[in-house]
UniProtKB/Swiss-Prot annotation:
This is Mitochondrial intermediate peptidase. Its main location: mitochondrion. CDD domains: M3A_MIP (cd06457). It catalyses: Release of an N-terminal octapeptide as second stage of processing of some proteins imported into the mitochondrion. Cleaves proteins, imported into the mitochondrion, to their mature size. While most mitochondrial precursor proteins are processed to the mature form in one step by mitochondrial processing peptidase (MPP), the sequential cleavage by MIP of an octapeptide after initial processing by MPP is a required step for a subgroup of nuclear-encoded precursor proteins destined for the matrix or the inner membrane. Coiled coil: none annotated.
Amino acid sequence: MLTRPAQNALLKSMQPLFRFRGCLLAKSTSTPRRDISTSSRKLAHPTTVPIPPSVDDHALVALLDQPSSFGIVSRLFQTQGGLFGHKELQQPSGFITLAEATLVRAQILTNRILRARESQDELRKVVKNLDRLSDMLCGVIDLAELVRNAHPDRAWVEAANQAYETLCEFMNVLNTDVGLYDVLKAVLSDPTIVQGMGPEEYSTAQIFWHDFEKSAINLPPEQRQRFVSLSSEILVLGREFLQEANTARPPASIHASELAGLKDKGMGARLQLQAQFTQKDLLVYPGSLQAQMIMRCAPAEEPRRKLYIAANSSTPSQIELLERLLRTRAELARLVGKESFAHMTLSDKMAKSPENVQYFLDALMDYTRPYARKALRTLSMRKQAHLQTPPFPTIQPWDRDFYCPPEPPAPPIPLPPLTLGTVFAGLSRLFYHLYGISLRPAECAPGEVWHPHVHKLEVVDEDAGVIGWIYADLFARRGKPSGAAHYTVRCSRRTDDDDEAEDGSIPAAEPYVRVSQSFESSKRHRVRGQDGEFQLPLVVLVCEFARPSVSSGPTVLDWHEVMTLFHEMGHAMHSMIGRTEYQNVSGTRCATDFVELPSILMEHFLSSPTVLSLFDVSSSTPSSAWQVGNHHQDPCHSIDTHSQILLAAMDQIYHSPSVVDPSFSSTSALEALHKSRGLIPYVPGTSFQTQFGHLFGYGATYYSYLFDRAIASRVWSQVFHANPLNRELGDKYKREVLKFGGGRDPWKMISHLLDSPWLENGNADAMKEVGQWRIEDEVGQPGRH
C-alpha cells in the first residue's frame, strides 16, 4: 500500500482525535523474571493470582516517578549522536539529505519493479519489492511526522516538514504510475504466482491493488488528471473545514436575571456581580468555562437555550464549505465508478458497503433506544420535579447537562493515588500475565531523543527477548501538541530476503544508496524462535502529564489519564505483537473499523478489581486521599450512545448518493434524521454539522468506533471478564488477533476468538449480529448523577 502511510500521517497532523539503542536481546535481570507455571496457566477456576512485581517493574516506577531521573539525561540530549540512534540524523540538515537519498534509492527500486515482467522469478518478487518500496518511503515519512509534531527545536521541525512533503509528493506519483499497476496486474493474473503466495503476501498484494484502483489508475489520462485535481481540492477543502470547525462561535447575550439561583457559588456569583456592576447583558462564548457552568447550573431554561443555539450555529459560508467538500468527494467516487464516496471508502473495510453499515447502525439503534428512552424518562421526572410541570415534560438538548451533570471518570473501586510509574508498572505486569511480555527501562545513547524528558522502554518477550521499543514522551512542555497520540515510527517486516543486490546500481547514485541503506539496516535483528531477520517495531507514545518534581513529588494521574494510557498502550501492543513479514499489514496497519479494537479492549481491563490490584495498591497513603470509586448507575450513558449512533448515521447520509442532488441540504438532512430517529428534539436554526471535524478525518467511517466498542465489549464479556489475568486466554487473543496485524481478514480473527464461525463471512447478518451486542464500556464514560 503506497498511499495509506502518507494519508494516515496527514490525517494525524490535522486531527485534534493511535517508534532506540539498548539491548537487542533479553538480558538476565538480577533476579529471575517471575514465571507463570504450566499449572497456573491452565486454571479452570476464574481467578489467576497476580504475580509479585519484578525488578523491571520497580525500575519503571523509579524511572518515571523520581525527579532525579530527569537530570541525568540532559547530557545525552545535548551531545548529538543521532536521533533514534541514526547517525544520519545528527542535525536537522540530515533529514534533507536522508530524504534525497531515499528518493534516489526508491527510484532505483521502482525501475526494478517496472522491469519485473522480464522474468517469472522477478514477477514472484513484485509484492515483496512493492512492500520494500513502501517501507523505504514510510520509514522516513513516519519519522518526519513525529518530529514535526513533537520536536521542540524549530529547525528540526522545518527540516522534517520538508522531508515529509518531498517524499509524500513522490509517493503520490507512484500511486498513479500505470507501469507499476500493470506489473501488479500481471502478478495477480498469474495463477501459479497467486497460488504460491502465503496469506500475508496475498493480503499485501490486495492492499496495493485496492490503493491503485482508488487512485483511478485504470482510467484514461484525462480522467486520471481530474482525479488528481479532485483529490487535491478535497485536501484543501478539508483543511478549511477543520479550521472553521474550530472557529469560535458568536457569544450568547444573557441577562443577569436569567442567572438567578445559580447553583455555582464561585464563578456563578462572579458572573452575577459583573452583570450588576456593568448594567449590561453578559456575553458568554460557547465552550467557555462560564458557558459550561451555566449549562450545568442555571435553573432557568432560557440562558441554557441561548447558549445551546449559539454553540450550534453556523454561517452560510461554513455550511456551503462542508457541502462543497461532500459534493467533491461524491464526484471523486463517481469518477472511479462508485455510487458514492461511502461505497468507495468501505469496499476494503470490515463493513464492505454502506448498506451493511446501515444494518449495523439500525440494529444498534434498535437495541439502544429502549435504554435511552428509559434514561430520558428519568431526566423528565427530574425536570417535572424542578419546574413543577405536568407529568413528563420534554427533555430539550439544553436540559441535558443540567439534569444529568457530567462528572470526571472514576475507577470502579476506591484506589490510592496512582502515580505514572505505578501505572506503567501495572501495565507491564498485565502484559506479562496475558502475553509473557513486559516493559523494561533502557538507556538512551547520546542524541537519541528529542527532549531530555523522553524515556525509552524495551518491550521484552519472555521467549523471544526484545521485540520492539516504546519511546515515552509523557510530560507537558511549551509548544507541545495537546492530547495523547501513538506514533508508529517504524513497522515490522522481514528483511533477510530483500534481495537488494538485484536492485541494480548507478555509480553516481552510490553515495545516496549507502545513506539510505545505513538508515534502514540499523533496525534489523534476529528474534529468538522466529525464522529470518526482522525490522522490529518502534513506537512513540506522546502525552502531556505534569512532570514529577522534588517539591510536588511524583506525577499522580487522574482516572481519565489512566484510561488514556491503557488505550494508547493497546495500540502499542498491537504494533509489538503484530510483527508480520510485510510492513503494510504489520501492527495497527489494518482496517479502519478494526484498528480501535485492541485499544478499547484495554480500557475494559480497568473495570476489573483483579487488574487494578496490579497497581500495587497496598500503600500507606491515607484513605482520605484515595480516588473515590464510581458506584452509581449512569442514567445518561445510553443517551450518549444513541447520540453517537445518530452522528454515525449522519456521516453515512452525508457520503451517500443523495449528496449529488441539487436540492441536498446538510441541515435539512440532519433535521430529518433527528425527526425520524432522534429522541431529543431537533432545534430549528441549528447546524451542528459544521463543527463535526470527524466528517473529514473519518468520512463514511465514523461508525467504526461504535463498531469496535461493540466487538470489544463482546470480547471482554466472553473471553476475559471472568479471569482477566489468564495466560491461556491472553495467548488465544494474541494468537487469533494481535499477531496478524492487518494480514488476515478481521472477521476470521473475531470469529475464531469468539468461537463463532457464523461471523466469518462478515456479511449483512454478521453486521446485524454485532449491532445487537451490548456496548458495555461504562468504564470509559464519565460518571453522572
